[in-house]
From Swiss-Prot:
Composition bias type Basic and acidic residues, residue spans: 66-80
Protein name: Mediator of RNA polymerase II transcription subunit 12
Compartment(s) where it occurs, according to its Swiss-Prot or TrEMBL record: Nucleus
GO MF term list: transcription coregulator activity
Organism: Aspergillus clavatus (strain ATCC 1007 / CBS 513.65 / DSM 816 / NCTC 3887 / NRRL 1 / QM 1276 / 107)
Residue numbers spanned by region Disordered: 1-116, 132-176, 1488-1530
């Protein structure tokens, strides 16, 4: 029926919405803006032919005269059949039937309704369904345009029940009956009918339905209603307007007032409980299934796919055989609506589950069968979805994919799937999905996002999975085709990190993905930056170090040392100067560290001196008081530090030369100190002077003012040192040098005697004076009488011998700054040999000259000299080779090197392609090395510019080789000259020459006497015909071949020869070398620098031959110096690159023959400054090594301790060494040093393990809480500090913990954690019981005791958590699980949860600084009170890392234990973090069916029973077993997002709630039976005091 408009209510029909027009489009603007049409013409219009679909008839649209009446007259019910033509009685049809000739006046239409009337869109929208309403005539359109008024505001929201879905039956029936030509007319009188969709209240009453009858009080017209109108008057008493306090106060003052109030409240609670309890038994029965033919079954499925067919009719004939995968496929192929498909699945599932109960099975077995069926059904759903995804590319795949995803998601959220299995399968499928199908899975990921991240078990796996997929996408995305996919993955990872940060705590894979995860965040955003910092810290705290790691933040001293060492390779002094000043705030300590680095015996090379001098100059310019720092360094004294003080004095002399060091200030300090007042006979020689007084003797005086020089001489005289000896020494040296270089220096006085003086006796005052004198002599020798430089061919500035002598003197002094000036003068020479030698000198001291800043300038001067010689037609092959070798070290001179190589190539090509000279035709017959004109003929052949054939080359080569093999021929030609001729011979035919040379060398190796090889090989290497690397490779290839090795006499001697080939000349030996010999030593130095590992191998192979028994007499002479040579090479290699050299010695030499240990020990003893002797190592040696450990000697002390530990000694000695190391670790940790970590780092794993185990034993031996005594506070603080020391040692050596875990540590940690928990409970109880004593002195003692306890509790909890992280592998389940291991794991989790989530006084565990323990060092300037994460958060992260490796059963046991037996910590069950870590606990729908024994199980009965009140339960045990799902504290059984009262239902037993009411999702089924019962669902709607009645 359609109620009259004056009834005051909206009609009970479909909800008001925009109705689609015939064209399928919604004409909302037209419906809202179209005014009312013409009034009705007749109450009973004649039928007209049907021309369109049925429309809603607006019977409330009246004319103006009808609106003046108050109420319309009663009339019979207009029972217009839906099949009649609605247009007959509509104004629209009247307008169409009678065309008007005149436009309709706007005054004839009723005015638009105001907002107080019916909603504007109530019937206007429905009129859009009327044919022609969407196309109004011109007149009405024009009139509407002229009478446009503002639209009325929308009405209030309709009640919820008005949004019921449209009745498909009515619409379908209307469509079927629309073809009836005639209209059915019924004569029954009009009567009011209650709408079928109205809510029914108790007592057959209907809510919100009051039709107008004319008999209401407001319908009575009297004088009062005519004047004042009608309104409901609420009778309000006078008492209601006042406060209730007087009346209630009198009742409460009465003795029985509280009891009466309690009775009222109890009655109210009883009433509420009675109304809130469902007592009626469930009448639900699943709809039956019948056997149908295939045709009928197909017809039934088609009806199911038709939304107009009601489900209640289909529930009568559900066909058999539609189940599992077939059901889903049928729904997909028939396009069954998702809601109806879910209804079918529920019907089939309810019948399947009911079948288990019909067979007479027990309740437990029925539950198991039901769970198995749900798992199988979930598997079918998984296969169905997987099949649709794999069919990508077929027709309608997108629609099928959308349907399949919607259906499976609906089944998931309706709790019709096993959530744990389904989500696990989803993650596995997402992990295995290739990148081409990954977008589909990412779309589905948004559906299950919240469920996947609800628990730690799935959230961590999802985080790792997404990161791995993004990593693969980035690796394969070479052309940015996968950029959208990578962006989508990054978006998911960003959302997970920001919203579910705990799921990104990845103990095992954080190092792998941390950079990738950071790239997904916006590091410019402060929030993102804070999240990633917090996350990095949380992950770092739960990770166990896999390898040895020294302190996280490198000490500034070691950082500065690394900067100093880097200059050797970078040569960037300016950058190192700036970085060093910013690394250390104490500038005096910085200067001290630089001076130690320059003078330490554990670094190699004179380059350090010039590096230190340049840095000190730059620091003084930057404002550092360098003078005071140097004086303070010398005043400390370094007698026992084994420093090379000569390097210190060398630096100071360089500073004095550059006027950077203030000599006057030093002399003032020396006089103020009083050191110079010692007696004359107390110091007879300057070597006994102190360091600060020794500097007085070392100061250069050439550039000092006279008064300063006189003051110095005075102080020396007062110190007992004769200044005349220094002057005599200078004069003697000048006379000696002048005799060697008479063309440069004038003759000296006769009084000067020429003598040789040891270099160690020369002071830097003497060396500096001689160096400047030599430089001055070379410079003045270049000037003529006019004072200008003489540049003329044939008049060189220096001869070759003079240059070699000057270079020998200055290199012996170590005065490379003066040598650089001499080389600069040598560039003006026109002798290619001198220029080549000068370039080789720069190359030999390249690092020092680079630091001085002279290498690039000298190279360019040499290139200019070469260009000058080239213009003059002079070609020097030696100069070109030297310049190429030097230019390769200069990165900015590659273009010049390329030009030089072009010139070298032209020279070689010219020689090889030139036609043979006629002179060479008679060479083979007349050429002989015994000829007196042999050198002249060689010069004529080699430098004539003509060519040479191979036969001529063979003759010359054989003659030179024969001459090279004869020692007596050195009178004619030296070996160096012969090798130079060989180098000149090679360009004519390089390949042929190399073949002949290799054959000759192989012949020498196979000869019985190889003494000539050691004599001829260095010059061959010096001229470049042979390289050291090529010769070593040749020897190794020959020795590897057994056939060739058998032809070589004494093959082991070759290994010794290789060692001797690499040994440089002694430091004190004269370095007067010609160009060939100097180049050989240059090749030695480059080989040692570029091939240190190959050198170590040569040393190892040679040392192994010392004790071999098959040595013959030919190698006796080589074995005599073998140890010394090997030791010299080892010292050079160890000091050049300490870290890598020590690593190699540890891995290769120590494990070799005992002789290797002996030589290595001698080399180390020499460096460390002591000798252990032949006796076995003892503990005193280890203690001495530890005392010598500093920032420079650390690698060598490591190696020395390793040799001591691996020496052939008894186990007692090894244990004593471990004891010494353990004591050193404690001492260094107490003094906050980390040198002990470096000492232990290179020791074998057995020694490291012993040290760590001793620290663990000492740590566990410390009591957690000291007993109460007088010194308790002091003892407690001492015990905490001691435990902190041991914990630091354990943490530094954690890399020695095996992956399989350490036996016994897990049980000890469990006991310690249990003891900590028991102590917490007992102390908390005692504190709560002593509140009445807190006054006066007792109060202070209680507060102090409580503070100490809190501090100890926080420290020990954090310390034990760190130990658990380090020994996490000890808690893993063994291959054969034992009950004891499971119990320990459960106890550990329970203890961590109870302590973490306990509500302690002052929230002690929420403040991490209370622990006073920081596992990682704080940064300088970081004033935060804590590292950034709370101790409580860290504890939960540790628990999460344990849960990741524990089985699911342990999680369930832990949750049940906390619920049943840990009542003091019951609040933890409602903590979201607790649920996050221990879930999922009963995620599936079948896990909720476990009920108490006295309550009928839903699985055992025919249908789910409704819970009964406690009074109706049969007698049972006093403490019935609680359901598993209820004991976990996790809401289960209902869809987690279901917003209904059923989610709060619970079961009662004897008046006490015992668990959640298990609502069964398979029985939440609408239209399950043809006849609706009072309670046909699992939960009666009577719970809400209302139910929905359907026809």
């Amino acid at each position: 029926m359609i109620p009259h408009s004056s009834a005051g209510v909206q009609p009970w029909g479909h909800p008001l919405r925009a109705v689609h027009s015939a064209s399928g489009l919604t004409d909302i603007p037209h419906a809202l803006g179209q005014p009312d049409l013409h009034p009705e013409q007749s109450s009973m219009p004649a039928p007209q032919p049907q021309t369109g679909p049925s429309a809603v008839i607006d019977l409330t649209a009246n004319g103006g005269e009808a609106q003046e009446r108050e109420h319309p007259a009663k009339r019979l019910r207009l029972d217009i059949h839906s099949g009649s033509n609605a247009r007959d009685g509509s104004p629209a049809s009247a307008g169409l039937g009678e065309p008007k000739s005149t436009p309709v006046s706007t005054s004839s239409k009723p005015p638009p309704l105001s907002w107080r009337g019916r909603p504007v869109w109530s019937f206007q929208a429905l009129l859009s369904e009327v044919p022609g309403a969407g196309e109004p005539n011109v007149e009405s359109t024009t009139a509407a345009a002229q009478d446009v008024k503002p639209l009325s505001p929308p009405s209030f929201p309709a009640p919820p029940w008005k949004h019921s879905p449209a009745d498909p039956t009515a619409s379908s029936a209307a469509g079927l009956r629309g073809v009836t030509p005639a209209k059915e007319v019924r004569t029954t009188p009009y009567h009011i009918e209650v709408p079928s969709v109205a809510p029914v209240l108790r007592g057959d009453k209907v809510a919100d339905f009051l039709p107008w009858t004319g008999n209401h009080p407001e319908d009575v017209l009297n004088e009062q209603t005519a004047k004042q109108g009608y309104y409901d008057r609420t009778q309000v008493s006078q008492n209601e307007s006042n406060t209730a306090r007087p009346s209630l106060y009198a009742q409460l003052k009465h003795r029985s007032g509280l009891q009466m109030l309690s009775s009222v409240f109890a009655a109210a609670l009883e009433k509420r409980q009675g109304h809130s309890m469902v007592t009626a038994p469930s009448t639900f029965k699943p709809p039956p299934r019948v056997t149908l033919t295939d045709n009928k079954r197909e017809a039934w499925l088609r009806d199911l796919a038709n939304p107009t067919v009601p489900l209640r009719r289909l529930s009568r004939t559900i066909p058999h055989g539609i189940r599992g995968r077939v059901l889903l496929d049928q729904c997909l192929t028939k396009w069954v609506p998702v809601g109806r498909a879910v209804w079918l699945a529920k019907c089939v599932g309810a019948n399947e589950i009911r079948a288990f109960k019909r067979k007479g099975t027990s309740g437990a077995l029925a539950i198991g069968l039901e769970a198995k069926w749900v798992r199988d059904w979930t598997t079918n759903v998984q296969q169905f979805l997987d099949g649709v995804i794999t069919s990508c590319g077929v027709a309608d795949w997108k629609l099928k994919m959308t349907y399949a995803v919607s259906l499976t998601a609906r089944l998931f959220f309706e709790q019709l799937l096993d959530h744990d299995q389904y989500l696990g399968w989803f993650l596995s499928s997402l992990e295995a999905a290739p990148l081409n199908t990954l977008p589909v899975w990412l779309l589905m990921l948004g559906i299950y996002w919240n469920h996947l991240l609800r628990y730690r078990k799935r959230g961590r796996r999802l985080a790792e999975l997404l990161l791995e997929k993004l990593s693969k996408a980035n690796k394969l995305d070479s052309s940015n085709t996968l950029r959208p996919l990578a962006d989508r993955l990054s978006l998911h990872i960003r959302k997970l990190t920001l919203e579910h940060t705990s799921s990104a705590v990845l103990p095992h894979s954080w190092d792998k993905y941390k950079d990738l995860l950071s790239s997904c965040l916006n590091m410019k955003d402060s929030v993102h930056r804070a999240v990633i910092q917090n996350l990095s810290e949380r992950n770092a705290r739960v990770q166990r170090p896999r390898k040895c790691q020294e302190t996280a933040n490198q000490p500034p001293q070691q950082r500065v040392i690394q900067l100093f060492d880097s200059i050797r390779s970078t040569h960037d002094v300016t950058a190192v100067s700036i970085a060093s000043l910013s690394a250390i705030d104490d500038k005096a300590a910085l200067v001290f560290k630089l001076l130690e680095w320059v003078s330490t015996p554990f670094r190699h090379g004179i380059c350090r001196v010039y590096t230190g001098a340049r840095l000190l100059r730059k620091w003084k310019v930057a404002g550092v008081d360098v003078d005071s720092c140097i004086i303070s360094f010398l005043a400390e004294g370094h007698d026992g530090s084994h420093l090379n003080m000569d390097n210190i004095y060398h630096i100071i002399s360089e500073l004095v030369r550059s006027q950077t060091f203030s000599v006057g200030r030093y002399l003032q300090w020396l006089m103020a100190k009083g050191v110079a007042d010692c007696s004359k006979d107390s110091h007879q020689h300057h070597k006994h002077l102190s360091d600060d007084l020794e500097l007085l003797l070392q100061l250069p005086v050439s550039r000092l003012p006279d008064h300063v020089r006189n003051l110095r001489n005075t102080l020396l005289h007062r110190a007992g040192i004769e200044v005349s000896k220094e002057e005599a020494m200078i004069a003697t040296l000048k006379a000696s040098i002048a005799q060697r270089l008479p063309n440069i220096f004038s003759s000296v006085t006769d009084s000067a005697m020429s003598c040789d003086v040891a270099q160690s006796e020369l002071t830097w005052a003497v060396k500096s004076e001689i160096g400047q004198w030599i430089r001055r002599g070379v410079t003045e020798g270049r000037r003529g009488s006019t004072g200008k430089f003489q540049i003329a061919i044939g008049q060189p500035v220096l001869s070759a011998d003079e240059f070699y002598s000057i270079r020998d003197i200055l290199e012996g002094f170590g005065d490379l700054s003066m040598l650089a000036d001499v080389l600069n003068q040598a560039t003006n020479c026109d002798d290619g040999l001198i220029l080549a030698s000068a370039a080789d000198t720069v190359n030999y001291h390249f690092q020092s000259f680079s630091v001085i800043g002279a290498s690039t300038g000298l190279f360019r001067r040499f290139v200019e000299s070469y260009a000058r010689l080239k213009r003059l037609g002079v070609t020097s092959l030696d100069l070109i080779l030297s310049l190429i070798d030097l230019g390769l070290h200069l990165p900015g001179e590659f273009n010049t090197v390329a030009l030089l190589r072009q010139d070298l190539g032209r020279i070689e090509n010219k020689s090889s392609m030139a036609a043979p000279s006629p002179l060479s035709d008679h060479i083979p017959a007349t050429f002989n090395e015994t000829d007196s004109l042999f050198p002249e003929k060689l010069d004529q052949l080699l430098f004539s510019g003509g060519g040479m054939d191979e036969s001529t080359m063979d003759a010359i080569f054989n003659a030179l080789i024969t001459s090279l093999g004869r020692a007596e021929d050195r009178v004619k030609l030296s070996a160096n000259d012969i090798c130079r001729y060989l180098a000149y011979l090679r360009p004519f035919h390089p390949k042929h020459f190399d073949i002949m040379l290799i054959r000759w060398i192989c012949g020498l190796l196979k000869s019985s006497t190889r003494t000539m090889l050691s004599r001829v090989l260095p010059p061959l290497i010096g001229v470049g015909c042979v390289t050291i690397q090529a010769f070593i490779f040749l020897v190794r290839r020959l020795l590897q071949s057994e056939k060739v090795a058998s032809m070589i006499p004494h093959p082991n001697d070759l290994k010794i020869d290789l060692l001797q080939l690499l040994v440089p000349p002694p430091a004190g030996q004269s370095r007067y070398f010609d160009m060939v010999t100097y180049r050989f030593h240059l090749s030695q130095k480059e080989f040692l620098s570029k091939h240190p590992e190959e050198t170590f191998n040569i040393i190892r192979d040679a040392i192994a031959l010392i004790d071999s028994q098959d040595q013959d007499n030919h190698s006796d002479q080589g074995q005599m110096n073998l140890n010394q040579n090997a030791m010299v090479l080892l010292q050079i290699l160890l000091t050049k690159n300490p870290e890598s050299a020590v690593q190699y010695c540890t891995e290769k030499l120590i494990t070799q023959h005992s002789t290797s240990m002996m030589v290595l020990t001698k080399a180390l003893d020499t460096l460390l400054g002591f000798d252990t002797g032949p006796d076995p190592p003892n503990v005193s040696v280890a203690e001495k090594v530890i005392e010598l450990t500093n920032d420079f000697s650390l690698p060598f002390c490591q190696l020395k301790l390793q040799t001591l530990f691996n020496a052939e000694a008894g186990s007692n000695v090894k244990n004593e060494i471990v004891d010494v190391m353990f004591k050193a670790a404690i001492a260094d940790s107490r003094s906050r040093r980390s040198n002990w970590v470096g000492l232990v780092r290179l020791m074998n794993q057995d020694a490291v393990r012993q040290i760590r185990e001793r620290a663990e034993k000492s740590f566990f031996a410390i009591p957690l809480f000291e007993e109460a005594n007088e010194g308790r506070s002091m003892n407690n603080g001492t015990s905490l500090e001691t435990a902190k020391l041991y914990l630091t040692i354990i943490e530094k050596l954690a890399y020695s913990i095996p992956d399989s875990g350490v036996q016994g540590v897990g049980s000890v940690l469990v006991e310690k954690m249990d003891l900590l928990l028991h102590k917490l409970v007992s102390m908390q109880t005692s504190y709560n019981g002593s509140t009445e004593m807190r006054h006066g002195i007792d109060a202070e003692q209680v507060i102090q005791s409580r503070t100490e306890f809190e501090r100890s509790l926080a420290f020990w909890f954090s310390a034990l958590l760190r130990m658990i992280v380090l020994h996490r592998s000890a808690f893993s389940i063994p291959p054969a699980p034992k009950s004891s291991a499971s119990q320990e794991q459960t106890r550990l989790l329970i203890s961590i949860f109870c302590i973490t989530l306990a509500r302690l006084p002052d929230s002690v565990l929420r403040l991490f600084p209370t622990a006073d323990y920081f596992p990682h060092s704080m940064r300088q300037g970081d004033h935060r009170p804590c590292p950034g994460i709370l101790l409580q958060t860290h504890a939960l992260d540790v628990a999460a890392s344990l849960i990741d490796m524990f089985p699911d059963e342990l999680r369930h046991q832990c949750a049940r234990f906390l619920k049943d037996k840990c009542s003091p910590f019951a609040q933890s069950q409602n903590d979201s973090r607790f649920l996050y870590l221990l879930g999922p606990l009963g995620d599936g729908p079948t896990s909720n069916a476990t009920l108490p024994v006295s309550i009928p199980s839903p699985a055992a009965s025919g249908s789910t029973p409704a819970p009964t009140p406690s009074g109706s339960l049969t007698a049972g045990p006093s403490n019935p077993p609680q359901p598993a799902s209820a004991s976990l504290g996790v809401p289960t059984g209902l869809p987690e997002g279901l917003n209904c009262g059923a989610s709060h239902l619970c079961l009662q037993y004897r008046g006490r709630a015992i668990g959640a009411y298990p609502v069964r999702p398979w029985e939440l089924l609408e239209d399950a039976a043809p006849i609706a019962g009072t309670n046909d669902t699992a939960v009666s709607l009577g719970y809400f005091d209302a139910r929905r009645v359907r026809a």
